[in-house]
Swiss-Prot record:
Growth hormone plays an important role in growth control and is involved in the regulation of several anabolic processes. Implicated as an osmoregulatory substance important for seawater adaptation. This is Somatotropin. It is found in: Secreted. It comes from Pseudocaranx dentex (White trevally). The gene is gh. GO terms for biological process: animal organ development; growth hormone receptor signaling pathway; positive regulation of growth; positive regulation of receptor signaling pathway via JAK-STAT; response to nutrient levels. PANTHER family: SOMATOTROPIN (PTHR11417:SF2), SOMATOTROPIN,PROLACTIN (PTHR11417).
Length: 206
């Protein structure tokens, strides 16, 4: 009886130890899936907010937003798809992490219900942790220093989230949702390109 128990435990231990440890591609797949979900949610929130506006208000807010900028624009990132493709995997990861971090607090001010905002904040925190794991597994001394040293932290939001009324609140809400959608699109692009670089896929063009 004892011999049978020992054999059974040995088989169970062997089964556990043979389970594959998540590799880069698995971690990247999880990160890309999470950011894709966040990007879709950002698009939906923005579309819902726009649909609640009058046509004239939409045009006016869009015109104002084009002349304005997002707080995260202080984070230096590739200016176009060509620069994105030339950037190292680590640099894309570092930028993605900063963009995600810049929304962990500000996501609490997104228009919508408390449950929605809470879910978004939780997803952002999970994504940041996943990206940090990828940075740790992909960093290589000199590259870390050269890439991370060029990425300044975004400054505080100041009075961006101060309670406003009327048209000002509407404008701030529009800008916040537009910036959130824009940044989630950036992160999804960067993580997708970085994932492709480390795979066997020959074509990583955008």
């Amino acid at each position: 009886m004892l011999d049978r128990v020992v054999v059974l435990l040995s088989v169970l231990c062997l089964g556990v130890s043979s389970q594959p440890i998540p590799n880069n591609q698995h971690l990247f797949s999880m990160a890309v899936s999470r950011i894709h979900h966040l990007h879709l949610r950002a698009q939906r929130l923005f579309a819902n907010f726009e649909s609640s506006l009058q046509s004239d208000d939409q045009r006016q807010l869009n015109k104002i937003f084009l002349q304005d900028f997002c707080n995260s624009d202080y984070i230096i990132s590739p200016i176009d798809k060509h620069e994105t493709q030339r950037s190292s995997v680590l640099k894309l990861l570092l930028i993605s992490k900063q963009l995600v971090e810049s929304w962990e607090i500000s996501s609490h001010f997104l228009p919508g219900g408390l449950a929605e905002r809470s879910q978004i904040s939780s997803r952002l925190a999970e994504l940041r942790e996943g990206i940090q794991m990828l940075i740790t597994t992909n960093q290589e001394g000199a590259e870390v220093f050269s890439d991370s040293s060029t990425l300044p932290l975004a400054p505080p939001f100041g009075n961006f989230f101060q309670t406003q009324g009327g048209d000002e609140l509407q404008r701030r809400s529009y800008e916040l949702l537009a910036c959130f959608k824009k940044d989630m699109h950036k992160v999804e692009t960067y993580l997708t390109v970085a994932k492709c670089r480390l795979s066997t896929e020959a074509n990583c063009t955008l």
